[in-house]
């Protein structure tokens, strides 16, 4: 792990995320003078929308005063994720049938923010705005939008489909386990972890086989795979559950084969032996074949 002191960009992101998260304060204050069922109105009724807009404008103005250039770009992204997480918390604790979507908002925003923060801790030299994974790919964006559209359409046309609490809880469990496994993999790999497949071996690059890597060769991908499917199980999105499973499986199969080419080039027989002993962790994916 890269030292105990968090780099400047990491500290800025923490402050930005907390500022965004402060969106939960207004409804909490309001509940002191009203009832809990008002909380959801905070997000849906006109006064609530106005309050959110003013709150965001004030926070953004503060960020513009505090930071410039690259640091502002970090802060505003972290703040956006904090706001999303905060709104998810508000919905999750509201008396509404949209509770599970609140869980989803928290899960999605936390995933993206924690990707940046953990990278800032373990491998600050590779840290960039891309570490948020917000612009991961066009396919990733389309998949996310598709899940929102499916949830909304089915919520309006087949509302009972979105009331399967046991299924949403199962999805939440998948999300928590997947998120935990991925972050454990990142922390275990330390400076060896990178969001981009490396084609050249760095001097500090070592083969990590301990911790969660003793169970799966690619624990970060295993975690991400089940996290992504879990988000759709949580939303009770039957179409996207199938779509996410197929798309994620194909993506990680190709990614693992590409990565293992580099790993065999870097570590030769050491990786081949490790590959023989430890599975990838993903169903029906064995990685690149070695003769």
What are these regions (language model features)?
Residues 196-224:
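Active-site-proximal inter-transmembrane loops
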Residues 1-203, 230-291:
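Membrane-anchoring alpha-helices and their flanking helix-loop junctions
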């Amino acid at each position: 792990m890269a030292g105990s002191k968090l780099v400047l960009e990491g500290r800025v992101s923490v402050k930005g995320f907390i500022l965004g998260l402060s969106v939960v304060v207004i409804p909490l204050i309001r509940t002191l003078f009203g009832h809990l069922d008002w909380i959801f109105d905070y997000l849906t009724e006109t006064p609530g929308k106005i309050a959110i807009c003013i709150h965001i404008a004030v926070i953004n103005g503060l960020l513009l005063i505090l930071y410039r250039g690259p640091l502002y770009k970090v802060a505003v992204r972290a703040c956006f994720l904090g706001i999303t997480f905060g709104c998810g918390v508000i919905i999750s604790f509201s008396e509404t049938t949209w509770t599970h979507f609140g869980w989803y908002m928290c899960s999605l925003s936390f995933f993206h923010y924690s990707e940046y923060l953990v990278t800032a801790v373990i491998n600050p030299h590779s840290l960039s705005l891309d570490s948020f994974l917000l612009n991961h790919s066009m396919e990733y964006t389309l998949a996310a939008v598709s899940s929102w559209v499916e949830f909304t359409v089915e919520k309006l046309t087949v509302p009972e489909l979105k009331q399967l609490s046991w299924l949403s809880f199962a999805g939440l469990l998948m999300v928590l386990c997947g998120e935990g496994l991925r972050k454990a993999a990142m922390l275990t790999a330390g400076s060896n972890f990178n969001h981009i497949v490396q084609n050249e071996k760095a001097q500090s690059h070592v083969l990590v086989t301990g911790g969660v890597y003793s169970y799966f060769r690619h624990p970060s991908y295993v975690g991400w795979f089940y996290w992504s499917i879990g988000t759709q199980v949580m939303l009770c999105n039957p179409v996207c559950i199938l779509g996410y499973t197929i798309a994620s499986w194909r993506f990680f199969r190709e990614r693992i084969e590409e990565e293992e080419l580099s790993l065999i080039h870097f570590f030769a027989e050491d990786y081949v032996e490790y590959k023989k002993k430890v599975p990838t962790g993903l169903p029906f994916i064995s990685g690149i074949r070695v003769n």
